[in-house]
């Protein structure tokens, strides 16, 4: 990284057990490297700019249930100044299965904690939406999925997918077709496509 991230990390070096800084094939390749060296029972990915919602959150989550395959919660979107913008348009349901993602990613990956027994590697054939596929594969394996009923993460508005909307939407359609079938995916994308067309008309741009 050449954006000053390493300098920030050095300030917190006493709290970081291992730092790797080397070339990679993109975001998801770097995350795969993290998965490969993870030694704990669970993984939780937060990207640069994202934060755990509050101190003691993990302790509270595991007090609710100590043996879930997947924990998920809500997300607070913040701007670059750390000001809260609000929650995501898609909100997590009280109960969650992989089938619920037919209409979109109901839980952001910043607010989902997954047992290492459920996880595989990110599929590097997807450049923008590999997290969607990764979460779906984990949910398919999971038997016990617990909703924390609280905000898990503060998510910095922007990022790779938002700056590449059209390629990201195309990848997500392909991923959903793989998991749900073409016609089911096409049907569920009709309202999404309508909203996108309205957006284009109103803004006269992509």
Where on the chain are the PLM-derived regions?
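Conserved nucleotide-sugar donor-binding catalytic segment
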Residues: 87-171
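Conserved donor NDP-sugar-binding/catalytic core segment of glycosyltransferases
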Residues: 51, 55-85
């Amino acid at each position: 990284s050449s954006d000053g991230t390493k300098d920030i990390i050095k300030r917190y070096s006493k709290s970081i057990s291992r730092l790797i800084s080397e070339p990679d094939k993109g975001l998801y390749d770097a995350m795969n490297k993290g998965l490969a060296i993870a030694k704990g029972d669970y993984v939780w990915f937060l990207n640069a700019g994202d934060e755990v919602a509050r101190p003691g959150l993990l302790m509270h989550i595991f007090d609710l249930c100590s043996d879930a395959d997947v924990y998920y919660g809500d997300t607070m979107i913040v701007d670059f100044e750390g000001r809260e913008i609000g929650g995501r348009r898609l909100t997590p349901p009280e109960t969650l299965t992989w089938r619920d993602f037919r209409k979109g990613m109901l839980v952001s990956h910043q607010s989902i904690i997954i047992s290492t027994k459920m996880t595989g590697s990110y599929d590097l054939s997807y450049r923008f939406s590999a997290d969607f596929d990764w979460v779906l594969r984990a949910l398919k394996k999971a038997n016990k999925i617990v909703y924390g009923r609280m905000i898990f993460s503060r998510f910095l508005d922007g990022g790779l997918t938002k700056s590449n909307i059209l390629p990201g939407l195309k990848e997500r359609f392909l991923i959903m077709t793989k998991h749900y079938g073409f016609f089911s995916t096409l049907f569920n994308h009709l309202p999404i496509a309508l909203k996108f067309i309205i957006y284009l008309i109103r803004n006269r741009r992509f």
